[in-house]
Amino acid sequence: MKLNELYNNLGAKKNKKRIARGIGSGKGKTAGRGIKGQKSRSGVAIKGFEGGQTPMIKRLPKRGFKCISTKKYNIINIYNIEEALTDGRLSTNDIITKEKLLEVGLINNKNLVKLLSICSDDFASPLSLKLDAYSSKAKYLIEKVGGQLL
């Protein structure tokens, strides 16, 4: 047997019905669309229409909204800054700003930056920070060791 002698078994592959190819084809004239009306015309697709029953979109209640004035913050933790200091990516002499954190790779976009102190009860290095927001605990820890919030 050669490749050019291969063929499908009988009935394994059914030819598709060619519609609108004359009355004798069995799907001619109206091409299975019925007679007249909106759904027999071309370009019809009534989105969300369920045949007169109340559509799903109307049956479900409205929920919430998207506030356009919401500020998106990059959250950074004090221990992330401590790690960057020990790695040598940041220095205690520098003023730590949003741009510096982006350069070092602690944040990945230019949204606002908020400093938190989750899981950090002590902080050794006195730093100068110029960020957009601070948690009260982070503020306290930085000022306790002689750091500045600009």
UniProtKB/Swiss-Prot annotation:
The keyword rRNA-binding applies. Pfam families: Ribosomal_L27A (PF00828). GO terms for molecular function: rRNA binding; structural constituent of ribosome. Keywords: Ribonucleoprotein, Ribosomal protein, RNA-binding, rRNA-binding. InterPro entries: Ribosomal_uL15, Ribosomal_uL15/eL18, Ribosomal_uL15/eL18_sf, Ribosomal_uL15_bac-type. Gene3D superfamilies: 3.100.10.10. Binds to the 23S rRNA. Part of the 50S ribosomal subunit. Belongs to the universal ribosomal protein uL15 family. This is Large ribosomal subunit protein uL15. It comes from Rickettsia prowazekii (strain Madrid E).
